[in-house]
């Protein structure tokens, strides 16, 4: 069984500063909403009462509009963090897995909520992670469970994301002369 620790720290350079040689891989959580010091959630005013109905109502009322007002800005925050995480992982020779990721952390499957903007960010995150070549395991979103009907009803989207993940080529830094990564890849 691979030895890892799940991280969602903002400063991925810590992987370079701290001895992580005992880890087989980094399981790093990355969400757009946490970038730039939680800027998105601050603008939504989603800081107190997480998991309370009032907090979710703020998300429903504000989040999609906020994203759609500056989609390229929010997308760049996400892709910059994914690329940086990939670069740092490459420097220290550790593959990446992400199991919680990409767009928004908390989104309810309430009636009539639009999932298109969430899927847009999640597709971007999935594609960007795959392109780095450093991810050996990629979740498509924070909403991979079938209880999220809003995500699961789009079978084609999931098939497209799965095809991207399965066809992603791994970087030579984890496939050639990397004993730790080779051991891990053999187990996967």
Annotated model-derived regions:
Residues 110-188:
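Aromatic-rich peripheral "rim/lid" segments of glycoside hydrolase catalytic domains that contact
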Residues 1-130:
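Extracellular glycoside hydrolase catalytic/binding regions
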């Amino acid at each position: 069984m691979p030895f890892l620790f799940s991280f969602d720290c903002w400063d991925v350079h810590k992987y370079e500063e701290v001895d992580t040689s005992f880890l087989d891989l980094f399981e790093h959580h990355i969400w757009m909403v946490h970038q730039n010091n939680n800027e998105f959630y601050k603008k939504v005013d989603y800081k107190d009462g997480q998991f309370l109905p009032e907090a979710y109502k703020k998300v429903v009322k504000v989040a999609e509009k906020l994203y759609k007002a500056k989609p390229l800005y929010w997308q760049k925050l996400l892709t910059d963090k994914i690329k940086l995480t990939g670069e740092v992982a490459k420097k220290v020779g550790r593959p990446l897995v992400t199991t919680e990721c990409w767009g928004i952390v908390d989104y309810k499957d309430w009636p009539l909520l639009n999932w298109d903007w969430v899927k847009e960010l999640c597709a971007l995150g999935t594609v960007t992670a795959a392109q780095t070549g450093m991810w050996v395991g990629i979740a498509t979103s924070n909403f991979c469970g079938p209880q999220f009907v809003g995500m699961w009803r789009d079978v084609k989207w999931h098939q497209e994301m799965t095809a991207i993940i399965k066809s992603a080529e791994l970087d030579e830094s984890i496939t050639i002369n990397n004993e730790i990564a080779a051991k891990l890849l053999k187990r996967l």
